[in-house]
């Protein structure tokens, strides 16, 4: 990751400008779903992930409350990511058919999944 991307990532993760969104993500991180009750939620803004020189940019609408807000990575740990990663793997764009948490070993070829501040 380049220094510019690292600076942008740090800026995004530390952002608290939209108080409504801060309250919402903090509430979700505190009032967990029963199935994730023993997991620690990320509860901060999430950043993009992937190859900064990618030819394919896949942009989602918003981080999932119990997916990205829980795992700390866009399109990770929820039902939409289960489907997405199977497709990416089948298309040879991902090295594995699933992504369950921020520090798993998933990587992309020619693909990045940004959040809107990157776009």
Residues of each region from the PLM?
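A polyanion-binding, active-site-adjacent surface
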Residues: 2-113, 117
């Amino acid at each position: 990751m380049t220094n510019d991307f690292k600076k942008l990532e740090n800026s995004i993760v530390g952002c608290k400008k939209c108080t409504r969104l801060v309250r919402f993500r903090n509430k979700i991180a505190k009032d967990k779903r029963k199935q994730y009750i023993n997991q620690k939620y990320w509860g901060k803004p999430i950043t993009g992930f992937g190859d900064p020189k990618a030819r394919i940019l896949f942009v989602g609408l918003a981080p999932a409350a119990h997916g990205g807000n829980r795992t700390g990575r866009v399109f990770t740990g929820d039902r939409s990511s289960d489907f997405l990663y199977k497709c990416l793997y089948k298309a040879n764009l991902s090295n594995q058919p699933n992504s369950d948490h921020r520090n798993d070993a998933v990587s992309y070829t020619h693909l990045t999944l940004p959040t809107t501040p990157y776009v």
